[in-house]
Amino acid sequence: MICRWIAFNSSKVSRSLSPFSSLLFTKSSFSVAKMDDESLPTTNSTSDHRGFYKEILFGMKKIGFREFLHGYHFRGLVSELRHVHVEEIMDELMSESSDLSVWFFKELRDIYAFRHSSFSTLLVSHVLAGQRRFKELQVILEQLLQEEGTLCELLSNSFRKWESTGLVWDMLLFLSSRLRMVDDSLYILKKMKDQNLNVSTQSYNSVLYHFRETDKMWDVYKEIKDKNEHTYSTVVDGLCRQQKLEDAVLFLRTSEWKDIGPSVVSFNSIMSGYCKLGFVDMAKSFFCTVLKCGLVPSVYSHNILINGLCLVGSIAEALELASDMNKHGVEPDSVTYNILAKGFHLLGMISGAWEVIRDMLDKGLSPDVITYTILLCGQCQLGNIDMGLVLLKDMLSRGFELNSIIPCSVMLSGLCKTGRIDEALSLFNQMKADGLSPDLVAYSIVIHGLCKLGKFDMALWLYDEMCDKRILPNSRTHGALLLGLCQKGMLLEARSLLDSLISSGETLDIVLYNIVIDGYAKSGCIEEALELFKVVIETGITPSVATFNSLIYGYCKTQNIAEARKILDVIKLYGLAPSVVSYTTLMDAYANCGNTKSIDELRREMKAEGIPPTNVTYSVIFKGLCRGWKHENCNHVLRERIFEKCKQGLRDMESEGIPPDQITYNTIIQYLCRVKHLSGAFVFLEIMKSRNLDASSATYNILIDSLCVYGYIRKADSFIYSLQEQNVSLSKFAYTTLIKAHCVKGDPEMAVKLFHQLLHRGFNVSIRDYSAVINRLCRRHLVNESKFFFCLMLSQGISPDLDICEVMIKSDELLSWTIKWGLLPD
């Protein structure tokens, strides 16, 4: 059989189709139903295969090729059809016409989903190659490669003498490299060399492309005889991907290019390489070189440079380049606008991103999933979750389906971070209903959000669901569960989960241990933290600085500062360096007990180790500085000394390039107020404003409370009035503090005035606020004023409680009045 196929293919004598081959188009009037009544030779399951395929051939001769294959009789035979039968039939058909054999192959495959043997597939492949039907050849061989592999031995042994075998080998090489079948492509290349078969430049380029990021690229390159533009461009791209940009430029100038000349594609690779490394100016110079060489930069060329400019923050230059694209005969595409929108997003300029998208729509371009993802990221980053949901709804209304996990994950993250877990779960379920399977990232986001809110039952249910779907949870997923349990104080449950992960044999990183150790430390369970630390060491896992920082915090929380100090030395024994958190945590413990000497020692040690302090570090230093002085023994000289040290501390911060923030100033102001240096506190308030830092309500609360505590009520009134003139929003605490101070000082008129302001500004006034005022007025025997506030409370729909009634009853002058109103308690 094989010999006859080889003889047919090797013969150069053209054959005319025999009458048998015309059966494909003849006897069209023959009734298929009538065929069932004809006497056809039949076979049973015990018949030999030769009789079986003869029955099929007889049927095709009797009624016509097409009619028989589509008839009911053949449909009944298909289930018994085997590879050997098909090969015998194709043998007969090949002797008449190769077209018939190919057609029979396709009919069985397409109509009856018959899975052909590798031999039949290679046979048809050789026929198609001989007829230069390369697209069909590619489809057939690609499927064969994916299902069976290269089958080099079968190809070598059975089809060596076919004239078209070189084309089949070449196509196999091309497809195997394109399908990233590395070992197969190299083996095919070796077999082709052994048989002296010609390898096309296209196939060589495909192999070269696959190895472009390795040194193997040069071995393939040297074997290519007829190099073309694609060959050179692939080498340049490979060198750029290997970050060998100087070699790429040198190769670009090589003499091998003299006949072809460099292409825009090669310049694009070099520009992209420089942009990825942040050397945008170099990329711009090559863009100019493209123009000097008489080449026309493509849209992709512009997009590379625009993206590079956006990544380094040169958004204005990127916009200018985009507007000049039409000068080079190209127009910005949706990718261009997406890059610009992302550039604005990276700078936090979401309004600019919206302007770019509006321009995009004006140009008649439609936003894609990437566009929406960029806008969603921007809105969620700014906390505009509702706007993000509007964008998602608009995306769906434009016909986009939830077929991309990225925008959904962005939205899920935004919802979970703002505590809107019910909406996150709704979106999560909608994704599944629309056929979009959540991935590991999506599951981890929702599980983390549920754990933050303490909804562990739902979190564990989702955890089990993802495991059932064979989505393996990673450290982030486990970390979310452990962190949530620790934050809720469920340390036993957290330890149980960690132990189950350890016993499962799964490789755990130090992060998971750190979460539980930190949970123990923050709860003051230092012994349990140390016990788990021993487990870490015994397991052979290297602890991190975060591990030791948690232990330092735990010791400090339990007032064992001496042991916490020793941890700094232990860190170094493990080849690690203490971090700024290590020192700041220990400094805070010393600050709480006013040990400024130890704080100074740690500060000097930080400088010696080259560890720069942070705003938090300096806030702790200021706290220690102020607490180091006994408040009751603080005379004017000591206050001035503290004041000057605070000013020097600010100068030190600025000299180290650390701009003081609100917390720093609030810390200084608070402790200056505690030592009764109010003038100094107001000086720092002015310094704060001069640094363009807006004082928070906490800052004003500290100052107003201090003025009232130390009896400077009029100054407090003036201060609040000046703040109101500046349209500064004050907190409820500021008003109630001053109201209570006026009541104590016996100035009910000002208290009434401020209370009206409190109500006018829409604050939620409770019975506790009325009780505080009435209580103080009654103690001062201010009957009418107490009565006024009592009536005001009733007018606001607030009923008095037992405490208020008792206070008013104790005032003799109010007793009869309370009885009159029927408010005497039982």
Swiss-Prot record:
Placement of PPR repeats on the sequence: 228-262, 263-297, 298-332, 333-367, 368-402, 404-438, 439-473, 474-508, 509-543, 544-578, 579-613, 614-648, 661-695, 696-730, 731-765, 766-800
Disulfide bond positions: none
Keywords: Repeat
Repeat among keywords: yes
PROSITE patterns in UniProt: PPR
SUPFAM superfamilies, A to Z: HCP-like (SSF81901)
Keyword rRNA-binding: no
Superkingdom per UniProt: Eukaryota
Short name of any one Pfam family annotated for the protein: PPR_2
PANTHER family: MEMBRANE-ASSOCIATED SALT-INDUCIBLE PROTEIN-LIKE, OS03G0201400 PROTEIN
Protein family according to the UniProt entry: Belongs to the PPR family. P subfamily.
Protein name, per record: Putative pentatricopeptide repeat-containing protein At1g13630
